Design a protein with these regions (language model features):
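Short loop/turn segments immediately following the C-termini of beta-strands
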Residues: 199, 239, 278-280, 324, ...
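Blade/loop signatures of beta-propeller domains
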Residues: 156-172, 286, 340, 431
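Blade-level signature of beta-propeller repeat domains, shared across WD40, Kelch, NHL, RCC1
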Residues: 401-431
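Beta-rich, blade/repeat-based domains predominating
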Residues: 178-193, 219-238, 242-243, 259-281, ...
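A short loop-to-beta-strand structural motif that recurs across blades of beta-propeller domains
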Residues: 203-205, 243-245, 287-290, 328-330, ...
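A short beta-strand motif characteristic of beta-propeller blades
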Residues: 172-178, 212-217, 252-257, 296-302, ...
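Non-catalytic cap/lid and distal C-terminal segments of serine-dependent acyl enzymes
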Residues: 1-155
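Short loop/turn segments immediately following beta-strands, especially the blade-tip
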Residues: 332-339, 426-431
Length: 431
């Protein structure tokens, strides 16, 4: 399920063969097809899935999409992740294999349903035969289908219905900025401007309504997070001094509170603030949530593995808190006095095969009620019922450390990825 094999093929095997035999091999996935059966079948599909720029055509015979090292997760991944530019031909046998890992005949049909659900360009054949059926008469049909209209490039399908409600056809990721050190803690102002911290560079930046990025404040004490309040002022926590700082719209700072080392901060429309922090002495349950109100700090929850980003549901009735060292984000009901009740590990997140945790970081909501969570797997999008419905990866497939929606029309999604920022127009709007 991981990308280990495709990196081995593309970065080691093929370059070695080309050099050893003095071959001029194309490096474009559009000129390549990868084929495999059984465990080789899922390996071939995983290669195209993780790196379509290396292999955009795949022939999968009796693919082992069963519970061997996470293979059973592929049908769900195909449904949730934005569709990728892959053309696939898959087969299964009516008397295919069955063992403790699962039933190949059934799971291959599940892959068929998932590929159809997400609009992939593919064909699926059920063959009267056993495990490995599909290498005979189907070969010619498979090759004709996989290579049709070549050299025209294979295009991604429309994605699943939930993704179609969010994405705009033809609107892909664009590089909005690069050269940063550690982008974190993005927050959107009422007018659609976005602010974020570049902690290692000791700066806070602003993304204007025209998409241009400028410095809002320098020498911030290594601001770790930012939030924009209802009055337009900006709050942050200094990693260096342990101070809660307020910046006015001109970028002038003042100290609000001393002795606070927070991971994330969130402003409530009523003027109060929520802060997450983590006690390093409590490795498995040191995360807390604090309420800052009338100059006083009150702990309103504890026992989180590693408390990270926060977001209000658009009606401010519920608060979500990321748990960075697990596959969850918490949901709380906000009481009238600002304290938190009805805590639940509610938002279940996808975890990469090679990761031990989802790595939930920054969170935000859209006006339409969808929650966007920055994770190691990309931006995971869910609704009020909890499960992740859509997962968006960025072009370099890197970890997303912060997420925000903003811009002139409040319909531009921003993904912050360490030293780069990506953006794309969507059918959702900032709160």
């Amino acid at each position: 399920v991981s990308d280990n094999n495709v990196r081995f093929f593309d970065e080691e095997i093929l370059p070695f063969v080309a050099k050893q035999y003095q071959l001029n091999l194309s490096t474009s996935g559009n000129d390549r097809c990868i084929v495999g059966g059984s465990s080789g079948g899922i390996t071939a599909f995983a290669a195209a899935w993780h790196k379509p720029e290396a292999f955009s055509r795949v022939y999968c015979v009796s693919g082992s999409f069963v519970a061997f090292r996470g293979g059973h997760e592929f049908p769900t991944m195909v449904r949730k992740f934005e569709a990728r530019p892959i053309r696939a031909y898959l087969t299964t046998g009516t008397r295919d294999m069955e063992n403790v890992a699962g039933d190949w005949f059934l799971v291959d049909q599940e892959m068929d349903k998932s590929l159809k659900f997400s609009g992939y360009d593919y064909q699926f054949r059920i063959i009267d035969g056993g495990h490995g059926a599909g290498y005979g008469d189907e070969w010619q049909e498979a090759m004709a289908f996989l290579w049709k209209n070549w050299p025209e490039k294979v295009k991604a399908g429309p994605s699943a219905p939930r993704a179609q409600e969010i994405l705009i056809p033809g609107e892909d990721w664009q590089l909005a900025g690069e050269g940063f050190k550690s982008t974190r803690g993005a927050s959107t102002a009422a007018n659609g401007e976005i602010f974020f911290a570049d902690t290692s560079a000791d700066k806070i930046h602003r993304i204007g309504l025209d998409g241009q990025i400028s410095i809002f404040a320098e020498k911030t004490g290594n601001a770790h997070c930012v939030t924009v309040a209802a009055d337009g002022s900006l709050y942050t926590i200094s990693e260096k001094s342990g101070q809660l700082l307020r910046y006015d719209t001109a970028g002038k700072s003042s100290v609000v509170l001393d002795g606070i080392l927070g991971h994330s901060i969130l402003a409530h429309p009523n003027g109060s603030l929520y802060v997450t922090d983590n006690d390093a002495k409590k490795a498995n349950n040191g995360g807390s949530v604090w309420l800052i109100k009338d100059g006083q700090k009150q702990q309103v929850d504890a026992g989180i593995k590693f408390a990270t980003g926060m977001a209000f549901r658009p009606d401010q009735w519920l608060l979500s808190v990321g748990e960075g060292h697990s596959k969850w984000a918490y949901s709380y009901q906000i009481a009238d006095d600002g304290t938190l009740t009805n805590k639940e590990r509610f938002f279940h997140l996808h975890v990469h095969d090679w990761d031990d945790e989802a790595g939930a970081e920054c969170l935000c909501y859209s006006q339409e009620g969808r929650q966007f969570i920055a994770t190691k797997s990309g931006i995971q999008i869910s609704a009020d019922d909890g499960p992740t419905q859509v997962i968006l990866t960025v072009p370099d497939k890197g970890r997303v450390t912060a997420v925000a929606i903003g811009g002139k029309d409040k319909d531009t999604l921003y993904a912050f990825c360490g030293n780069k920022i990506w953006s794309r127009k969507i059918q959702q709007h900032a709160t």
